[in-house]
Amino acid sequence: AFTPTLHGKQLIVVEDLVSKKGILHPVQEAMVKFHASQCGFCTPGFVMSLFSMYKNQSSYSEELIKDSISGNLCRCTGYRPIIDAAKSLNKTIKTDHFNKNIKKTISLLKKISSKSISIIQNNKKYFSPKTINELKKIIKTNAHPQFLSGGTDLSLKVTKNREEIQNIIYLNEIKELNFIKKSKNHIEIGANTPLIRFEKFIYKYYPDFNSILKRYGSVQIRNVGTIAGNIATASPIGDTLPILLSLNAKVFVQTKNNIKEILIKDFFISYRKTKLKSGEFI
């Protein structure tokens, strides 16, 4: 159901980390050197989390390391050697076969069409609009669509309940919905704004909110999850909802004809039910 969301992106899995010549990636070498793999069941996840940290940061403090691996669980409780392995990366020369091929990779990605996507096959539909206007047009011709952004909640319906989602509209390519605006009296957060971006922004104004967001899932979840998704699913375990309720936040909803403003305390009706009608979106 979610495979088309990979369009235009580079997918790197743990098997890709070893070079074609069989040379281990610096992250893998560190894990071996510090005996950071116990039973091995969780090792691929830790390796990929540290690989992401390795590629996106220039130095690795213990706080950053712990945050980077927070989405992984080692039942053997072998965290000390894992953290030691990660710290040792500060002493390595930051290069790998991905860096050597980066120009080629970027060139290939640029050749991929960036136009909106529409897939209809075997009674299943998938749309990926680029603008709000395109989204509105798709909604008009598709009854009861399932909106998808980060998919951190929706994906459980597929992986746990084995549900088949027939009519998906992927929102993550709509840049108009990815923003943070601050005025004198309030902060506006776009529906598509990743939690990780908001987490970094909000520290200056509400450090306690930042602290809570750091406990929200893991870096992987916060990289794709959105506050609007947290609100729209009306989950009783939505991490941001108690804070948004206490701040008397407002939700802006696009209806068929206009945009309406709803106090968040009035937005929720009951368990996993909101005032959003079919075709309306935040």
Label every PLM stretch briefly.
Residues 10-13, 26-32, 36-37, 47-58, ...:
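C-terminal structural segment of proteins
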Residues 1-14:
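S4-like RNA-binding module at protein N-termini
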Residues 22-24:
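Membrane-interfacial loop-to-helix junctions in multi-pass transporters
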Residues 17-19:
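Extended heptad-repeat alpha-helical coiled-coils characteristic
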